[in-house]
Regions:
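Binding-site signature for planar aromatic cofactors or substrates
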Residues: 1-181
Length: 181
């Protein structure tokens, strides 16, 4: 059933590229484990052991706080189609805000999206596939655009103000690095 791989191969990359969403879970030694769903065609495979996603401003910034505390994370893709499969990527995150070296290195790989807050790079240590037989069969209706429409309507100044209020510390009080030079 479950198989481990040291890196992504062409078949796994094709599977990732076909998925409309993914989940990222992260944690530090103490505090809550965070789990977030992500979409918006913002995930990119950059190499067999490297991927990244464009992170949009949201109500929290847990992954950034956890990246500062060691970066342990798992990214999961699962197929909701007739071809079941679950793919987990185990590794560590690094986060780069606009203007950072990480941002400059990878930003051109992403479409510009309103509210883009940071790029989360993920160094893959191992991959695991599982059957996915317990995952429900569902049909994608459409990608939600509410979040990017919200930030486009608010504009950059209001978005930056929101980040300063809501994204500087995690729900456990850990610094996220947002706003640091």
């Amino acid at each position: 059933m479950a198989k481990f791989f040291e890196a992504l191969d062409d078949k796994l990359i094709a599977f990732i590229e076909a998925q409309p969403m993914f989940f990222i879970a992260s944690a530090v030694g103490e505090g809550r484990v965070n789990l977030s769903p992500k979409g918006l065609d913002a995930f990119r495979v950059l190499g067999p052991n490297l991927c990244a996603y464009l992170d949009i401003t949201g109500s929290g910034n847990e992954t950034a706080a956890h990246a500062r505390g060691g970066g342990r994370a798992t990214i999961m893709f699962c197929s909701f189609t007739r071809n079941p499969l679950v793919l987990r990527l185990y590794g560590r995150t690094r986060v780069g805000a606009p203007g950072s070296a990480l941002w400059r290195r990878y930003a051109e790989r992403f479409d510009a999206l309103p509210g883009a807050r940071q790029i989360v790079a993920f160094d893959i240590e191992s991959c695991q596939t599982a059957c996915g037989f317990g995952v429900p069969l569902m049909k994608l209706e459409r990608t939600r655009t509410t979040l990017t429409e919200l930030w486009a309507a608010k504009g950059e100044a209001a978005t930056a103000e929101y980040r300063d209020k809501k994204n500087r510390v995690s729900i456990d009080g850990l610094p996220t690095g947002w706003g640091e030079a």
